[in-house]
Amino acid sequence: MAQVMISQHPLVQHKLTLLRRATTEPKKFRELVRELSQFLLYEATLDLPLQERIVDTPLAPYHGHRIAERVGLVPILRAGLGMVDPILDLIPTAHVWHLGLYRDHATLKPVTYYNKLPPEVDVDLCLVLDPMLATGGSAVAAVTVLKEWGASRIKFLGLIAAPEGVQALHQEHPDVPIHLAAIDDCLNDHGYIVPGLGDAGDRLFGTG
């Protein structure tokens, strides 16, 4: 799939291995999510358009550039929250809107319980953030909500995916690029990615 990009950066693969360890404590887990999110953001924004900007250095004017597009971050609650701050560190002007989607454990289907999108679209690029792309239901639902809202350019950023989730998102929204650190083997009977890393939300926030 041309729209699925898996980072092969050695640091990404090194840190992803540390993230997966069952013995990694929540504090270290959050730090690793932060670092991996920034690596993925770097790769996902390589095509951001630029416009010329002139600034004064201590010696002379300099003809430089600035990002031409307005960026919006859409973390899927709650695990997506762990990816917001590291991205804001690099794009401090980004807008942040929250979508609350939980997976019904009986049907494995997403249920929307929170939506804080403004009345009108005021960004050029939306980045949907969720560390885990498992069944793909939440990601598909989030992108659908954004398109119905009027967003025209959307990308998905996640750390680990199952083939089923990638297929579901790509099939429903083939125009949405998917940026990942890894695609794992499969989903188990409970809808968890295998080998995965467990429940990302629980590990981020020390619950479960």
From Swiss-Prot:
The keyword GTP-binding applies. Allosterically activated by GTP. SUPFAM superfamilies: PRTase-like (SSF53271). 5-phospho-alpha-D-ribose 1-diphosphate binds at residues 78, 103, 130-138, 199. Its cofactor is Mg(2+). Uracil binds at residues 193, 198-200. GO terms for biological process: UMP salvage; uracil salvage. HAMAP family: Upp_B (MF_01218_B). The keyword Signal does not apply. Catalyzes the conversion of uracil and 5-phospho-alpha-D-ribose 1-diphosphate (PRPP) to UMP and diphosphate. Its EC number is 2.4.2.9. Pfam families: UPRTase. It comes from the Bacteria. Belongs to the UPRTase family. This is Uracil phosphoribosyltransferase. The lineage of its organism: Bacteria, Bacillati, Chloroflexota, Chloroflexia, Chloroflexales.
